[in-house]
């Protein structure tokens, strides 16, 4: 006890101040970052499980919102609608990429005297790899980025909190509806994209290089088993659900004002593209890695 404590008339600033004892600052440890990353991954997986688990309830309670989002996914809004929405973007991307496949395939096969097999190149590579990846990129760049921006704007404007206050389950209403709409819409969109990639390859081979249409169609149909088309649709449906989940997650948890929304959109596009590339490798190995549905000889 000091002399100041014994003087009842001491000035308040001279008396010792008693307050909460703050814990000492802990130095960062080497495993903090991996642990934080693991915790973030667990939160994301929990969010995805919550979204997918709410599908039956959402189908029952919000059918009109799902239909509205179906139109938005297919035809877009604002400036995106001017170019035909997601349909227009997918048509353009698959047409030109399919044309490149036909052009490069013909040039490579012509060097060894087997240019007549260019129909095989289109049927094999467009179906298994090229069309699903291009469709996934188009979906991420249009629908996914739009969903991230929408949910991010709602989050920073406190609209998500307002839904919670009104007892509306925000995850069901904002995220699950978008996942359902994207899953349903990707099927006709991918039909258009896959057929357009086939048309691009055929157009280059027949009209640019002058190959007989009958020859091209013969080898194209010969090396296109129906199971490959079904598995191609399986890939793009898995891609679509994963892309929308990633974009909605980052938009739903955006913070930091308009700049934060922009960062969320960029992070969502990067993450979805990398995830699709890794998942494409895994699914291709699982679906076609140990067996083949096409035999060129034998």
What is the role of each PLM region?
Residues 151-176, 257-261:
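Short cytoplasmic-facing helical segments at TM-TM junctions of multi-pass membrane proteins
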Residues 97-127, 195-237, 246-267, 290-298:
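Membrane-interfacial helix-loop-helix connectors in multipass membrane proteins
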């Amino acid at each position: 006890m000091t002399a100041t404590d014994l003087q009842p008339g001491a000035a308040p600033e001279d008396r010792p101040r008693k307050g909460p004892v703050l814990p000492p600052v802990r130095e960062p440890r080497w495993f903090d970052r991996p642990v934080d990353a693991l915790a973030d991954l667990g939160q994301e997986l929990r969010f995805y499980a919550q979204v997918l688990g709410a599908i039956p309830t959402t189908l029952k309670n919000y059918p009109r919102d799902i239909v509205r989002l179906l139109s938005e996914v297919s035809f877009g809004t604002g400036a995106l609608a001017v170019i035909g929405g997601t349909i227009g973007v997918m048509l353009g991307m698959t047409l030109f990429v399919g044309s490149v496949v036909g052009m490069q395939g013909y040039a490579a096969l012509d060097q060894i005297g087997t240019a007549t097999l260019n129909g095989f190149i289109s049927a094999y590579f467009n179906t298994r790899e090229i069309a699903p990846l291009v469709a996934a990129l188009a979906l991420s760049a249009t629908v996914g980025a739009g969903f991230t921006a929408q949910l991010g704007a709602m989050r920073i404007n406190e609209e998500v909190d307002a839904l919670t206050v009104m007892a509306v389950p925000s995850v069901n209403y904002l995220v699950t509806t978008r996942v359902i709409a994207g899953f349903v819409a990707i099927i006709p969109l991918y039909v258009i994209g896959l057929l357009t990639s086939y048309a691009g390859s055929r157009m280059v081979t027949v009209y640019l290089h002058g190959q007989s249409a009958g020859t091209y169609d013969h080898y194209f149909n010969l090396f296109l088993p129906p199971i490959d088309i079904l598995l191609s649709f399986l890939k793009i449906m898995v891609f679509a659900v994963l892309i929308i989940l990633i974009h909605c997650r980052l938009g739903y948890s955006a913070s930091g004002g308009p700049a934060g929304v922009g960062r969320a959109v960029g992070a969502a596009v990067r993450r979805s593209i990398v995830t699709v590339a890794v998942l494409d490798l895994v699914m291709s190995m699982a679906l076609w890695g140990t067996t083949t549905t096409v035999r060129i000889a034998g």
